[in-house]
Amino acid sequence: MKTLRCLFFLLTFAFPAFAQIEGNPENFCRNGFFPRESSEYKLASVKGGKNEKVYFYDDSGDCPNDENCRRKSYLIPNDEVIVSRNFGKWACGWYQPKKGSETVGWIALDKLEFKETSRNPARGDWLGAWNYAGNQIEIGKGKTADSLTITGDAFWKGLGDNVHVGELDDTSKPAGNELKIGENETGEYDCKVTMRLLGKYLIVSDNLQCGGLNVTFSGVYQKK
């Protein structure tokens, strides 16, 4: 990696915000794990009758296989969701509204119609300023026809003025719809990032070594 800088402002003790995916119950479906739990994400549209509500279901206890697991949040026909994996008759879905935060949870599989997406996107599809929850990733043209430059900023804000940040600055070549940073790094604390282009979404996952404590670039990004 060309450059990775980690800055700490008023560093204080804090508990890690992310647990390891290994060992999680099979019924877990949460936004913190979503960008890192699959390598085969899919796009789907919600289907249903006029004015039908397709509800999200919780992942606690014996959920989602119980009506008591039904949340208040719901989707309507033609809403677009990203699916990471299936669990029985359920799909773990991420819905990103035009404004506001995402909703992640179990959705009935029979209420989804999956879409075909390109596994070999054009170079231009990668280019631009991508944003998720205040984190930013900028992808530009590299010096060679098949390379891309990647810069980024991420932060985690704790109590008061306690802020931890991380930066990306590298060049890489996409392989299909994947773009990786630090793939050949061998150090225990080297930053590694995988970006997957899925339609208008950039699904980013890292190894939690790309910045200060609790900083991660993981998330589902969209162009500004």
Question: How should these model regions be labeled?
Answer:
Residues 109-117:
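Structured surface patches comprising rigid loops and adjacent beta-strands/short helices at the edges
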Residues 2-9:
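Sec-dependent signal peptide recognition
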Residues 14-17:
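N-terminal signal peptide c-region/cleavage motif recognized by signal peptidases
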Residues 132-177, 205-207:
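N-terminal glycine/threonine-rich, aromatic-flanked beta-hairpin/loop signature
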Residues 60-70, 116:
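Short alpha-helix capping/helix-loop boundary micro-motifs
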Residues 119-138, 217-224:
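Tryptophan-anchored aromatic micro-motifs
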Residues 194-196, 200-216:
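Short, exposed beta-strand-loop hairpins at the edges of beta-sheets
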Residues 21-39, 68-110:
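SH3/SH3-like beta-barrel superfamily modules
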